[in-house]
């Protein structure tokens, strides 16, 4: 597949964030986030993918064609990974006030993960500059299905953001891992963790999780859901500063989750999320 030449023009934002809001849960088009419960082979979301190396930016001194403004107020960094809006591509939206450039180095880092940016758009609103990337796998031309690779995309983008905008490091939980300056404030996991499950039509439920962010969180959430034989049909994973917000469309044997199963899922997630240092083998 030919590499895309990015020529996105600035425009006013219209419906920038395709996120499912906490008060409106309208059905979206069927997405291709592969199911996790024992489905047919073509629908399997693999959890055993080999570890993916997260490429780092080539230079921390460059600004990736963006603004390196060091004002007192650092905007909240946001990275949204959306598997709902486009049936053919994974949509990623990146925001850091008005400081981001064209992210060409970030797109090169994504290419090193075996991915292709097939479309890019840029828009402006009162919160700043929003860059959207439509991403597919180079090997298949299809959207990303593996949670490990989705997490690698998230970490790659955040790593590059911190490399080019080190002032964002203290605003991100992952700044303690990738950045020169860890967060100045710590999030109380017990207070920050919220888990809600809603009915979302005749064949699925909507799981909404908000908690303190940490590396590998997306993969951990998917694994916990899979361990209960619940299927993730599609979803979205947002990184907003020190917090992470997941919105997953889930089902059990093609049906919404009954109340008892909702409670099992919520308890399992809460147990894990409130023990961030728990090793996988002890769960």
Curated annotation (Swiss-Prot):
Record-linked PANTHER family: ACT DOMAIN-CONTAINING PROTEIN ACR11, ACT DOMAIN-CONTAINING PROTEIN ACR4-RELATED
UniProt cross-references to InterPro entries, sorted A to Z: ACR1-12, ACT-like_dom_sf
Organelle targeting sequence: 1-56
Induction (free text): Repressed by drought stress.
Residue stretches spanning the membrane: none
Biased composition (Low complexity): 48-63
Organism whose genome encodes this protein: Oryza sativa subsp. indica
Keyword RNA-binding: no
Note: On the 2D-gel the determined pI of this unknown protein is: 4.7, its MW is: 36 kDa.
Entry keyword annotation includes Repeat: yes
Region entry Disordered, spans: 14-78
Gene Ontology CC entries for this record: chloroplast stroma; chloroplast thylakoid membrane
Domain ACT: 91-171, 206-276
Compartment annotation: Plastid, Chloroplast
Top-level taxonomic group: Eukaryota
Keywords, sorted A to Z: Chloroplast, Plastid, Repeat, Transit peptide
Protein name, per record: ACT domain-containing protein DS12, chloroplastic
């Amino acid at each position: 597949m030919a590499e895309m030449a990015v020529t996105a023009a600035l425009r006013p934002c219209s419906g920038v964030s395709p996120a499912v809001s906490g008060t409106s849960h309208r059905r979206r088009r069927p997405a291709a986030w592969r199911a996790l419960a024992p489905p047919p082979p073509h629908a399997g979301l693999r959890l055993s993918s080999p570890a993916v190396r997260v490429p780092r930016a080539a230079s921390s001194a460059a600004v990736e064609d963006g603004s390196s403004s060091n004002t007192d107020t650092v905007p909240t960094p946001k990275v949204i990974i959306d598997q709902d809006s486009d049936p053919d591509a994974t949509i990623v939206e990146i925001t850091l006030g008005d400081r981001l450039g064209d992210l060409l180095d970030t797109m090169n880092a994504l290419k090193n993960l075996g991915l292709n940016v097939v479309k890019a758009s840029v828009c402006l609103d009162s919160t700043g500059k929003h860059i959207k990337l439509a991403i597919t796998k180079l090997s298949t031309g299809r959207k990303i299905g593996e949670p490990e690779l989705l997490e690698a995309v998230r970490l790659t983008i955040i790593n590059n953001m911190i490399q080019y905008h080190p002032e964002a490091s203290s605003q991100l939980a992952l700044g303690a891992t990738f950045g020169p300056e860890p967060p100045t404030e710590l999030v109380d996991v017990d207070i920050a963790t919220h888990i809600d499950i809603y009915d979302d039509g005749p064949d699925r439920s909507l799981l909404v999780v908000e908690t303190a962010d940490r590396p590998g969180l997306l993969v951990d959430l998917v694994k916990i859901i899979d361990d209960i034989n619940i299927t993730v049909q599609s979803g979205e994973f947002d990184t907003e500063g020190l917090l992470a917000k997941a919105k997953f469309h889930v089902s059990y044997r093609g049906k919404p989750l009954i109340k008892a199963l909702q409670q099992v899922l919520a308890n399992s997630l809460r147990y894990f999320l409130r023990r961030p240092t728990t090793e996988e083998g002890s769960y």
